[in-house]
């Protein structure tokens, strides 16, 4: 079977939502109801955490001037001290044991690097979590529990191995097995052909992880393709491994779980009803299987609120292409994994016993419609180039276009530092009449914080709110296009796109190819002005931020 040619112009019945993590943002321990969900969001670091230590009470009688000055100096030093260790042991300098290398990726709480063990020369992955971004006590508890669960599950074949955890004054560092093969989505979209059999192999590994977790008394609570990595670049020997146990919990007998966690497209209906158990992991795996077979999630909308409404409605499409050509056995498994009633939903053992998923089972080698691959490639990163374009336009809007937003920024930036912290954003939104929850405010800050430093600077604020000022105006779009078209050729070449994106650490070679594939409608290998405008105008409302939309 040869490589399939992906027809990017082929019309599909509904728009392809972005579930790559750019618009489908991970929801960490959200304390909100489905009706209160914010609009599309992008994962980004959390708010700046300011540590305040209460001053010591002065003893009676009052000290002499010299003693008083010593006490004041001691108080100043106390305010600079960090909170008590999260791991409950003395701080360690990780650089004494490991040398940190290039960045592998960024998440809500920190950055993952490649690191080398000094004593052995072996490479590992180091997930460095910035403690100032752990705003709530619950955030700190989640980190402790993540480490406990990873140690507890250590040695299981389809789970990323943790080597150790270290803590210094600024960060908690998790040193883990290095998975050099990349994310599950990359494996799917790179294949020369894609079949039901390939989908069965992938979902079998996913459900084996679920089975191990449930057998050992753990609910993952955030299963999605981005949280599965390939152990090596050699496809023949590579294993699929689960990672990111940041919202996972130990199963407690008789406990009803109520907090809404996970990622929008993969959330089970009982999570939204705040009454769930381990069956939610099977639902999430069922969503992954649905995507593997057709390229779209079973429940989609332009906003998280809309997605949740579709999930609660529970109607699954098996009529649109390519479902008529998918085997009945595959559809039967999907239906049983996505049973609305968790009591009727398959267990992990039942899934693995299904004839379609078993090794040597009914899953066919027949290639799935190439449009599925095309859609799945679109799920990866479409907004990367658009994000840079918005930033450029924000930097170049006229003064009169920015007056209102400039005043709003100044009013929120109460300490006149030139940046807005979490507390300033929360206070400013309350003054505007906003009724957003604490979690939603944090998410807004993360969405706008492009450089990941935990605060919003002026340009980031304008980028997040400026669509009210007609960002799609022709002159702004043309200037943005010229900014990327360095040689004035009338096209944005692959090299020009690569230069622009790598300047902001916003994309690797695969990502750049995918953006060109998606935007380049005439398939000439570059992006012309009309293609650029079409990209900027598509789903433009999804960029709108609640920063300027009080409820």
Swiss-Prot record:
Ca(2+) 3 binds at residues 485, 487, 489, 496. Keywords: ATP-binding, Calcium, Kinase, Lipoprotein, Membrane, Metal-binding, Myristate, Nucleotide-binding, Phosphoprotein, Repeat, Serine/threonine-protein kinase, Transferase. Residues 25-39 have a biased composition (Basic and acidic residues). ATP binds at residues 104-112, 127. Residues 98-357 form the Protein kinase domain. GO terms for molecular function: ATP binding; calcium ion binding; protein serine kinase activity; protein serine/threonine kinase activity. Ca(2+) 4 binds at residues 520, 522, 524, 526, 531. Its EC number is 2.7.11.1. Activated by calcium. Autophosphorylation may play an important role in the regulation of the kinase activity. Residues 400-435, 436-471, 472-507, 512-542 form the EF-hand domain. It catalyses: L-seryl-[protein] + ATP = O-phospho-L-seryl-[protein] + ADP + H(+); L-threonyl-[protein] + ATP = O-phospho-L-threonyl-[protein] + ADP + H(+). It comes from the Eukaryota. May play a role in signal transduction pathways that involve calcium as a second messenger. This is Calcium-dependent protein kinase 19. It comes from Arabidopsis thaliana.
């Amino acid at each position: 079977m040869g490589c399939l040619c992906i027809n990017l112009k082929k019309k599909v019945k509904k728009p392809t939502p972005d579930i790559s993590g750019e618009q489908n943002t991970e929801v960490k321990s959200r304390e909100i109801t489905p009706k209160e969900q914010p609009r599309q969001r992008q994962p980004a670091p959390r708010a700046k955490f300011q540590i305040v230590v209460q001053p010591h009470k002065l003893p009676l009688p009052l000290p002499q001037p010299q003693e008083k000055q010593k006490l004041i100096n001691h108080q100043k030093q106390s305010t600079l001290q960090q909170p008590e260790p999260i791991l409950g042991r003395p701080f360690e300098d990780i650089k004494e044991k490991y040398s940190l290398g290039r960045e592998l990726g960024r998440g809500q709480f920190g950055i993952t690097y490649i690191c080398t063990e000094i004593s052995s020369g072996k490479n590992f992955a180091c997930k460095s979590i910035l403690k100032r971004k752990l705003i709530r006590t619950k955030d700190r508890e989640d980190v402790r529990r993540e480490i406990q669960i990873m140690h507890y599950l250590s040695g299981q074949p389809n789970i990323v191995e943790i080597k150790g955890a270290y803590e210094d004054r600024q960060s908690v560092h998790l040193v883990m097995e290095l998975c050099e093969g990349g994310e599950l989505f990359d494996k799917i979209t790179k294949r020369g052909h894609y079949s039901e059999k390939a989908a069965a192999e992938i979902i079998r590994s996913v459900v084996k992880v679920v089975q191990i977790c449930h057998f050992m008394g753990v609910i993952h609570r955030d299963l999605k393709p981005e949280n599965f990595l390939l152990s090596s670049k050699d496809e023949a020997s590579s294993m699929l491994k689960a990672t990111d146990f940041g919202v996972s919990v130990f199963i407690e007998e008789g406990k009803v779980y109520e907090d809404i966690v996970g990622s929008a497209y993969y959330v089970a209906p009982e999570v939204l009803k705040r009454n769930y158990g381990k069956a939610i992991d099977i639902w999430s795996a069922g969503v992954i299987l649905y995507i593997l077979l057709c390229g779209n999630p079973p429940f989609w909308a332009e906003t998280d609120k809309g997605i949740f409404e579709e999930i609660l409605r529970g109607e699954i499409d098996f009529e649109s292409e390519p479902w008529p050509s998918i085997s009945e056995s595959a559809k039967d498994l999907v239906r049983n994994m996505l049973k609305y009633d968790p009591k009727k939903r398959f267990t992990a053992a039942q899934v693995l016993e299904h004839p379609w998923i078993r090794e040597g089972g009914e899953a066919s080698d027949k290639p799935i419609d190439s449009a599925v691959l095309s859609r799945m490639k679109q799920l990866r990163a479409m907004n990367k180039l658009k994000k840079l374009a918005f930033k450029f336009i924000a930097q170049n809007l006229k003064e009169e276009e920015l007056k209102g937003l400039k005043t709003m920024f100044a009013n929120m930036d109460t300490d006149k530092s030139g940046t807005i912290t979490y507390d300033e954003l929360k206070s400013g939104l309350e003054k505007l009449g906003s009724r957003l929850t604490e979690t939603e405010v944090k998410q807004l800050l993360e969405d706008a914080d492009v450089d990941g430093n935990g605060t919003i600077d002026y340009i980031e604020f304008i980028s997040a709110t400026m669509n009210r000022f007609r960002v799609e105006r022709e002159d702004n779009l043309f200037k943005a296009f010229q900014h990327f078209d360095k040689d004035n050729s009338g096209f944005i070449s692959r090299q020009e796109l690569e230069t622009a994106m790598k300047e902001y650490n916003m994309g690797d070679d695969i990502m750049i190819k995918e953006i060109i594939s998606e935007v380049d409608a005439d398939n000439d290998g570059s992006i012309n002005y009309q293609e650029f405008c079409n990209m900027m105008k598509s789903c433009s409302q999804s960029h709108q931020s609640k920063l300027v939309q009080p409820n």
